[in-house]
Amino acid sequence: MHEVSLVHALFDQVDRAIAPHPSSAARLLIVRIGELAGVETELFRTAFAGCKAERGYQAAMLEIEPEAAEWRCAECGATFPTGAPLQCTRCSGFARLFAGGDIILLRVELEVVDV
């Protein structure tokens, strides 16, 4: 289950993002997971729940935004949904994956602890 290593990489990003704010705690992580990112969303949620306490994020919640795959013609820019032929019907150019292939940390919401 590579989702565990992806969750640890996510926490590494969060560590770097909140380092300038030592008196804060991450409360919400919003992550975009693409349809073709090779990630099982439910396994990712399970890995997050299982790893967050050991990384010091026991109070953090996870919100996932799914992203549909979208292909774009390299020649003319026409877009295609997943499942369509990967050759442009407009110009016969080849399509490339434009969206839906990544995992992106979109936002970290912090709670600032009074000192």
Locations of the language-model features?
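Short loop/turn motifs enriched for small/polar and acidic residues
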Residues: 32-36, 65-69, 108
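Flanking scaffold residues of small Cys/His-coordinated metal-binding clusters
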Residues: 67-68, 82-83, 100
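Short cysteine-rich clusters marking metal-coordination/redox-active sites
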Residues: 73-74, 88-91
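Short, intrinsically disordered, charge-biased short linear motifs at domain edges
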Residues: 58-64, 72-79
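Long, charged N-terminal interaction/targeting segments
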Residues: 1-58
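Cys/His-enriched microdomains
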Residues: 71, 86, 103
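Long, charge-rich boundary regions
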Residues: 1-2, 104-115
